[in-house]
UniProtKB/Swiss-Prot annotation:
GO cellular component, one term: cytosol
Localization in the cell: Cytoplasm; Nucleus
Gene behind the chain: gid2
Name this polypeptide is given: E3 ubiquitin-protein ligase gid2
Pfam families: CTLH (PF10607), zf-RING_UBOX (PF13445)
Family assignment from sequence similarity: Belongs to the RMD5/GID2 family.
Gene3D superfamilies: Zinc/RING finger domain, C3HC4 (zinc finger)
Domain of life, per lineage: Eukaryota
Function according to Swiss-Prot or TrEMBL: E3 ubiquitin-protein ligase component of the GID E3 ligase complex recruiting N termini and catalyzing ubiquitination of proteins targeted for degradation. GID E3 is regulated through assembly with interchangeable N-degron-binding substrate receptors induced by distinct environmental perturbations. Required for the adaptation to the presence of glucose in the growth medium; mediates in association with the substrate receptor VID24/GID4 the degradation of enzymes involved in gluconeogenesis when cells are shifted to glucose-containing medium.
Amino acid sequence: MNIDEWQRIEETAPGNKCLAKLNELESILKDAKKSCLKDPTTSMKELVACSEKTQQVFDDLKRTEKKFHTSLNRFGKTLEKKFNFDLEDIKLHSSFESKKREIDTALSLHFFRQGDVELAHLFCKEAGIEEPSESLHVFTLLKSIVQGIRDKDLKLPIEWASQCRGYLERKGSSLEYTLQKYRLVSNYLTTKDIMAAIRYCRTNMAEFQKKHLADIQKTMIALFFCSRNEVLSGTNDSHDSIHHIISNNAQLNIPQEYIDVLDLDWKSLELLFVREFCAALGMSLESPLDIVVNAGAIALPILLKMSSIMKKKHTEWTSQGELPVEIFLPSSYHFHSVFTCPVSKEQATEENPPMMMSCGHVIVKESLRQLSRNGSQRFKCPYCPNENVAADAIRVYF
């Protein structure tokens, strides 16, 4: 579908044009009223002129609206023609016939995860599935913490990060330090109390100096710059302080690297916390249902085009366990490595999984069976001189 068709609708949209004409007519009528009040003898002449102008504006509005609706109707027909497809051509109901309970569970978890607790309770009841009590507690906690971050109240996030400090340190995460840093800067920008900021830093951030000393120093210097400015200007107004500092930095003369420290990105902090929270509990950052729907939306146009081509060529899709065309998904949707057997050059599947031999090299199960003559004899590894026994091979999970 050509984007020009949509641009044509935007160009013929009557909103601004009609408003401009009505404003012009209003101005003319007001001028005519003033003229009549000033010189009543011209009233009839002014009324005739106003009537003619009103009719002219009315006719212009009708033409503008008609032109717009013509473009809109044409675009609607183009949409119908473009998206006239039958999803039944690419359905695969057999894949879901025995998975209704799993699908219902995924839906309920999505509702809980989105915070739609009442809807989730009702769905579980009507679907006849048990409510995931542990997940409910986790998602309720996450919702409370995220709301705290949005309200710039970091008490709950810091408590959670402190409780999970061991996990975060093993993972190499700087979440707890980042939360403390945001709280330090946020408190200062609100209170403008530099001594309170120094005390907070000594009490709550000393334990992070081994790893984050340079950043702590940079943060405190940024606060000292702000404090210096307040002393020199004699003001202590906390209202929208960071935006005031940024907009007036030419006069304040604070180096840009310290301005950047003060400009807190709360949305990024929220995303960082949710990522670490979900990782700590073995959950994905995004709802699995979101991922499935988004991946399906990306694949749908390609599969529909493939189905159309196969219909024209009178062929059928006979592949099992794989698609006849490649679907390119974003890198964030790549969760598992794809293993290709060095012997058969085939990709591993659930039915033909990768197997690691005692020498450490990996081939797929079918290649292992063929090399060992159905497990009846020892065989030499295709890539090293070691001999192996099929029974010693173990499945590999990527």
